[in-house]
A protein has these predicted regions:
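Conserved AdoMet/S-adenosylmethionine-binding subsite of the radical SAM
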Residues: 1-75, 79-86
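C-terminal accessory regions of radical SAM enzymes
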Residues: 77-109
Length: 109
C-alpha cells in the first residue's frame, strides 16, 4: 500500500537504487486494502517516485483464513484495464496468479 512507503522506506530504497540495483515490486490484490483504482494508482506512482518498478500484482492464493481478502479475478482484470487508461505502460504491473502444478506465474493481464 502506498502508505507503507514513508520517508524511512524511501531513504532505504534510495540507497539500494543508488547502488545500481534494479528494484521491482510485487503486491497482492486484497479486498478492502488495495482493490480500488485510486489505491493501485497511488501505489504505482509512489513506487516510481522511489525508483521501484511496479512489477507484479498477485491474485491472492487460496489459503485458510484469508478468504475475506479475496478479490474476484474479473475485478482484478477491470482494475488493470483502468490503470492502463490512466498510467503509462511501465507503471502498470502484470496481474498474475500462481496455479497449482504450473512451474511459473500465470499472467492474467
Amino acid at each position: 500500500h502506498a502508505n507503507e512507503l514513508d520517508l524511512f522506506v524511501e531513504q532505504a530504497l534510495a540507497k539500494i537504487a543508488n547502488s545500481g540495483a534494479m528494484l521491482l515490486n510485487q503486491a497482492v490484490l486484497l479486498r478492502g486494502v488495495n482493490d480500488s483504482i485510486g489505491s493501485l494508482k497511488d501505489l504505482s506512482q509512489r513506487l516510481l517516485h522511489c525508483r521501484v518498478l511496479p512489477y507484479y500484482l498477485h491474485q491472492l492464493d487460496p489459503v485458510n483464513g484469508a478468504a475475506h481478502f479475496e478479490v474476484e479475478v474479473k475485478k482484478g482484470l477491470q482494475l488493470i484495464a483502468e490503470l492502463r487508461s490512466c498510467l503509462p505502460g511501465y507503471a502498470v504491473p502484470r496481474y498474475v496468479q500462481e496455479l497449482r502444478g504450473e512451474p511459473n506465474k500465470t499472467v492474467l493481464a
